[in-house]
């Protein structure tokens, strides 16, 4: 099931990015106008049996024009192996993106959530993005602008529907992306000053309800496999169904995301 969900994301990425470059080992998804956004400039390894050194070489080949390196490994077992190997190469790190499929959403109502277009919650989205970084990071405003733009492009590709809570003075948001019989809950965030009030649960439940109303057979969310939000998603009815390993090398200067 994880492969089908990944294919859903890849289809959106093909439509949202400016370029998709084919290589013998896989593909690179690029948006040269958004160089600070990692999610807009990354590569996918689709060939089995590559060594960590070969993966690094592929990253250098495909992302030579960028300060960062970000490369995902399509096959889960290959990704697990390469994540171990990459640890021996200075500057590189591995992360695990946990795919979680909705199994039992329960019967609880969404609560005080409001559906709005992105234009109606753009200021909140910008503040949520900025809150992910230290306020003194270099190029913070430019990075936030580029991430917001990439989110807009992805939303256009996936027919995004945004949900905020509370309905008055919103402090949390998420979106629902759609394609065929699949819905993805994405970009969940709550302002730091409003955390602990259950607002993330409220917007996620609203997105789940919208996904069910849209007739999606499968609704999923992606979380950091080593961070706490996955536990919240589990309480809302999502269950793990696979992992995507992403290998990264941060830039030596500046800031990216």
Predicted regions mapped to residue ranges:
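A conserved beta-strand-loop-helix scaffold within acyl/acetyltransferase catalytic domains
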Residues: 149-191
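Conserved beta-hairpin
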Residues: 20-25, 81, 85-89, 93, ...
């Amino acid at each position: 099931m994880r492969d089908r969900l990944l294919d859903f994301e890849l289809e959106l990425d093909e439509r949202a990015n400016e370029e998709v470059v084919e290589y013998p080992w896989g593909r690179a998804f690029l948006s040269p106008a958004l160089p600070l956004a990692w999610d807009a400039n990354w590569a996918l390894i689709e060939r089995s049996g590559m060594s960590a050194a070969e993966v690094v070489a592929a990253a250098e080949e495909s992302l030579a024009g960028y300060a960062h390196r970000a490369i995902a490994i399509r096959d889960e077992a290959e990704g697990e192996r390469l994540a171990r190997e990459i640890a021996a190469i200075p500057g590189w790190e591995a992360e695990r993106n946990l795919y979680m499929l909705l199994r039992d959403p329960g019967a609880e109502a969404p609560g005080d959530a409001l559906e709005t277009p992105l234009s109606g919650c753009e200021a909140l989205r910008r503040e949520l993005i900025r809150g992910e970084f230290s306020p003194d990071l270099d190029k913070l405003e430019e990075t936030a602008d580029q991430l917001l733009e990439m989110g807009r492009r992805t939303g256009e590709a996936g027919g995004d529907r945004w949900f905020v809570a509370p309905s008055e003075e919103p402090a949390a948001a998420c979106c629902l992306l759609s394609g065929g019989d699949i819905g993805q809950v994405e970009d969940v965030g709550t302002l730091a000053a409003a955390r602990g009030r259950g607002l993330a649960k409220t917007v996620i439940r609203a997105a789940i309800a919208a996904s069910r109303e849209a007739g999606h057979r499968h609704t999923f969310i992606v979380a950091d496999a080593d961070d706490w939000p996955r536990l919240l998603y589990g309480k809302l009815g999502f269950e793990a169904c696979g992992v995507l390993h992403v290998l990264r090398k941060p830039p030596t200067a500046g800031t990216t995301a």
